Amino acid sequence: MKRLFFVLFASMALAFGASAQTAEEIVARMDKETEKGDTQGLAMTMSMKIPIVGEFSTRIKARGDYSKAESTVKGEKVIFWSDTKTTWTYTANNNELVIEPSKGSQNDEGELVKGITSGYDVSIKGETADAWQIKCVKQKSNQDKDDPKTMDLVVSKKTYLPVRLVAKVKMVTVTLSNFALGVSPEEVKFDQSAYKDAKVIDKR
């Protein structure tokens, strides 16, 4: 009987050990999943909490070199579109469309989650039935002054996509959430015919 219990216990221990994953393995799998956004498109919500100014959120969609961001700040709705050459900014309150050359050569919105834990030590601080809670601590070798000292990351056990990432940069708390794969080109490409009545300011 004792031998039977020992065999059962050993089998359970082996099974648990085989299924357990380290924080590094979870993050590596997460990076692999978010890379699919290059071809499938990736959407997320970025919320910022700023002292005095308050809190506002932006819904971001990106696919390849194209991106679209919609934000409402103090009742004013603003929509941004961009590709490698041009940026369009539409302000709903005054029905104004500003067209400018893009400042970057790539889709910055799509890069928000790529290698986001690079330069950080990661460890599992807890888990639920649905997700892992991972603590990210900035490495001493990371000399980027803009990188926060710590980040709190939650990763879905089902999809391996981030569920939420919270970081504090100086006095600003930034939260990335509501991640989803699957964005069509039509969702992110600017269609000027939809804004033919807007006042256009072309700065190209």
Which residues are covered by each model-predicted region?
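Sec-dependent signal peptide recognition
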Residues: K2-L8
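N-terminal leader/targeting segments and the immediate start of mature chains
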Residues: F5, F16-S57, K61-D65, A194-R204
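Non-transmembrane domains of secretory- and envelope-associated proteins
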Residues: Q21, I26-R29, P51, T128-W132, ...
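Short, solvent-exposed coil/turn segments at beta-strand boundaries
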Residues: D38-T39, I60-K68, W81-T87, T128, ...
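A short hydrophobic beta-strand element
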Residues: Q40-M46, D130-V137
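An acidic-aromatic
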Residues: S57-N107, K170-T175
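Short, surface-exposed charged micro-motifs
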Residues: S57-R59, K77-I79, D121-S123, T150-V154, ...
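Flexible, surface-exposed loop/linker segments and immediately adjacent secondary-structure boundaries
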Residues: N94-N95, P101-A129
